[in-house]
Amino acid sequence: MDNMNIRKINGFTVQLVADGVYAIDEFGIALMYLIIGKTQALLLDTGVGAGNVHAVVKELTDLPCLVVNYNHHYENAGGNVWFDEVYAHKNAVIVLKEQNCQEVRRAFIERQLDREEYNGEASVADTISYLHEYRVNPIEEGKV
């Protein structure tokens, strides 16, 4: 790490922002946060999914990781495919399941690569077609 606590992992820009807290930037397109606790980690959002954020998490910690989506928007949940299980608000569950298909994934990632913010570091030839069924656990308001 340099004096800004920034490093690259698989093209993602990772910055240590506090003790055990990392900001993970997915190619200038999406931002996620990883909080590492004593017995497990928490990943807030999974980004677009153009890159393998799970591999980045594994590079930063060996602890089991709980994954939570802020909402169902693909820029927050496109990387869910890299995990077996995620948590989201109960109203987002149906949408998350519906958008986990090849057509939605490919179209969304291709649109993101055309954005001005995209830094050109993603190689999506292998990742754009990756699809994995994951379990979505509903969270109700007031339960966390």
What are these regions (language model features)?
Residues M1-V14, Y118-A125:
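Short, basic/low-complexity N-terminal boundary segments at the transition from targeting/disordered tails
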Residues D2-R7, V21-E26, D126-S129, R135-N137:
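Short, solvent-exposed secondary-structure boundary motifs
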Residues R7-E59:
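Conserved beta-strand hairpin/beta-sheet module of binuclear metal-dependent hydrolase folds
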Residues Y22, K143-V144:
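Short beta-strand segments in beta-sandwich/barrel cores
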Residues A50-K143:
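Active-site HxH/HxHxD metal-binding segment of metal-dependent hydrolases
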